[in-house]
Amino acid sequence: MHPLLLDALPDLADELSTLLNQGGATELATQVPFLRLVDRCRCGDDFCATLYTAPKPNGAYGPNHDSMSLNPSSGHLILDIVDRKIVCIEILFREDLRTRVLQLFPQNSAGKQLPESGDHTL
């Protein structure tokens, strides 16, 4: 089972709820306690901590996609929304969150666990 955002990153869940409510997006704010973390972005950029709350599509999200840029005190938070549901939380330039996201999803870019010791070739 995928972890709840609220359990895995409670401070991020609180921040999202607060920012969404302050911006008048109460319908989206009510989704935050129920968001499950499916995966992280695998782009490899050292400033990216993006999280998927639905499986990443093969290609574009499609015609019912929207995005919402929030105004956090640091970094960037951008929500990808499909059919009025949060499907991705783009988290950029937030090293505090990146470290924790990498701990939650430590696989390499191919989605395989790295060996704990010894040979690290895949």
Which residues fall in each region the model found?
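Aromatic- and glycine-enriched beta-alpha-beta binding-site module
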Residues: G62-G111
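N-terminal domain-onset segments
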Residues: M1-D66, V101-L122
